[in-house]
Amino acid sequence: MGALDMFQVVKRDGEVDEFKIGKITAAIHKAFDAKEKNYSEEMIDLLGLRVTSDFQKKITDNKITVEEIQDSVENVLIQAGYADVAKAYILYRKQREKVRNMKSTILDYKEIVNSYVKVEDWRVKENSTVTYSVGGLILSNSGAVTANYWLSEIYDNEIADAHRNADIHIHDLSMLTGYCAGWSLKQLIQEGLGGIEGKITSSPAKHLSVLCNQMVNFLGIMQNEWAGAQAFSSFDTYLAPFVKADNLSYPEVKKCIESFIYGVNTPSRWGTQAPFSNITLDWTVPDDLAELPAIVGGKNMDFKYKDCKKEMDMINKAFIETMIEGDANGRGFQYPIPTYSITNEFDWSDTENNRLLFEMTSKYGTPYFSNYINSDMKPSDIRSMCCRLRLDLRELRKKSGGFFGSGESTGSVGVVTINMPRIAYLSKTPEEFYNRLDRLMDISARSLHIKREVIGKLLDEGLYPVSYTHLTLPT
């Protein structure tokens, strides 16, 4: 064993220590004891020697890492017919890792708080919608714990290491939730807000002012059950019947829309972050809704959505004027981000609303425009969720089942960014570039698959009560 003693072991913290075979045999001892297996000292010593033989080829410059030695222990135990002992060793190895992480976490709590208070961590300003405040500190602290949970308890080492090494970036690790979602405004109008046992339930809104208040509360609640944007589609189409039913004047309509816009720009997540919200405005009544009876107060009215074009124009005018005016200091509103559908039926004439729309666009650059001219898609085929996600419902309809592919209630489980510049920098040939990319794409896809399973399980178990209610009740 004299030759073996010359090798050095590189520890996880980078320190180098002399190789000692006794540490291998001690770990194998514990694995056999855990399974209550009979063994002799000679057998343990023999297995230890086989381990040293197994990792010979891994030694570089007379050095080998702890992880490489542990991999060899697992291989040798399995090859020797002790698969159950190997499993016990793997669990022992994982437990040791958790203990190390726990020690690190205990030491890091002070650093986590100080890095936020002293603005030393880039994450303090990662989200432009979060204000530096005690509420932001609460989000930062809980986010650090949750991110560590994802990386140490849920994702496997390959995924966690790829994120820690910046080969990929897994977004929103600070929240144990899905990414973004689009919700059925029709369902909210039909059923009201609530449905959670033991909590206050609101009846379907009968007036525009009440509906605007319910939408603000709904988006604020959903922001706490999802990491990213929350969206409503056909905003102007669904709100117009409330204007018609109460024969509201334009000043009354504008007052309601103002309350909605101010409401969704008020911080509601720990008092520090406004809901990231997106609304799609049809501008003209879409074909899939035109012939349907309008709904107010949860009941069908004696008129259809196509009969509410004048009221739609009032909704759109009130929304755009409020966005142009900004707040009391003249500052533009961040939310909601409006998306407008441009179809062959879009009226390009010099109307008041058209002038206002493009004035808002030129002043703030706020709206997104979905171009359906010369397209085989219709506005009803697309749901805009946020600044980087648009879902093609035609593709979702090909999928069967699942909480994330059912009509209007659609969304995204998560987002992963691949570090393409690093791949390009490290690759010497196009072939190497694509090989590296393939590997990271597989890792990214697996991380999203794992996240989908975890979020689906937590949804079933009731961790997201309002989302569960709106995803499972009939519409």
Question: Where do the protein language model's features map onto the residues?
Answer:
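Charged, amphipathic alpha-helical regulatory modules used
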Residues: 2-106
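Conserved catalytic cores of very large enzyme subunits
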Residues: 98-99, 105-471
